[in-house]
Amino acid sequence: MKSISFDDIAAAQKNFESDRAHTVAKNATTSAGVRKAARVPEGVALNPLTFDVEVKQGDRTNQKRSGRCWMFASLNTFRYRIIKKYNLSTFELSQAYPLFWDKMEKSNWFLENILDTLDEPLNGRLVSFLLTDPIGDGGQWDMFKSLVKKYGVVPKSAMPETANSCNTHEMDAYLTRYLRSAAKRLRETATAGESLESLREMKKEMMEDVYTLLVTCLGQPPVSFEARLRDKDDNLALSGTFTPQEFFAETVDMNLDDYISIISAPTADKPFNHTYTVSRLGNVVEGGGVRYLNLEIPELKRLAVAQLKDNLPVWFGCDVAQSYLREEGIMDTRALDVDGLFGFPVEGALDRAERLDYGESLMTHAMVLEGVNFDAEGNTTLWKVENSWGKDHGRDGFDTISDPWFDEYVYQIVVDKKYLTPEQLKTFETEEATILEPWDPMGSLATLR
């Protein structure tokens, strides 16, 4: 290895001082920060507030200081159907309810993976990966689908938010600590020669402790509840006592198995028009993990537009922090000129595939597509997005995505499989999925707070 010499430093300093633009950039950046100094005013003006195709949603939701964006996005697609079916002004499903069961199922998933890797070295990559974040808040559509098929949904009034659902950090920290100690006990007991049957008895007791911790933090999830909905004209639209599973079946009108995950990963190890899954990624054991069909970006746009034109919102996952004006709610590759600020390629140094390969980008956040604009030739130009950061964020709680930003940073959408071509549908339903490593970027979990 070669160290940095003082001659190297002197040369770098001379290079900096040789261009007045560097000094101007330094003065702006040290005062305002990188993103504000790189902000392009025209980036805001390029994003109008009207849309050619648009679905109308209820009041904006707020995940607060939790990583439940994937749950909020999923529930926002559900509540849209409820609002439309019963002619409601607005409505909200409980986000604390699926959080409870997700933590319960992830804990079980983690301990099952520990039992399945007893012969793996503790300091090996696989076990180290499993121990890194056993029950984080993040997730994907297939994981949410598994939760709903097993546990249903409830109105927010049936299981309201708590301090720990609004801010999951402390609960997650203590549950993670407990699960890591449980993993230690299971591995050490196995090393001592105990049978798998004995280990499973230990795990059963551990899961009772997990349940106790979750009820303490989130409250008891309802087994049944009364629900009454009034429409915009104050007429009683729904009244009765339901289980969570009955409430989903009665109000949402959605076959969960019809909605599938489409990804767009242009890396060499993932040829397009094939199916993929991720090893050891999931939550509900009987849910079967995740399954994707990998298509090119133009196909993701075609599918999303088709569903929006049928007046249905679209769940999607993206790398939200890239080229993002958070206060204005604008995601646009023209919004920030970081390369111009520094005078060399930074944001433009890697293409979409290279960013995935070199760890620069992956899916970090899930939201909902609510609308789209087209140019004179029918090409998409701008997308309306329902976020879950409250009404004071962005433009009254919604964001916009430029079409070039979609090209670069949208990685996953969820659509009704009826919009696929016959060839695409056959591939998704019949092809044996290629198994990706647990740490593959397509296994990232939408979790941004």
What are these regions (language model features)?
Residues 290-292, 300-306, 354-359, 368-375, ...:
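Generic recognition of flexible, low-complexity loop/linker segments
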Residues 375-449:
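Conserved catalytic-core surface of thiol
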Residues 44-314, 393-396, 403, 411:
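Active-site nucleophile-adjacent alpha helix/oxyanion-hole segment immediately C-terminal to the catalytic cysteine
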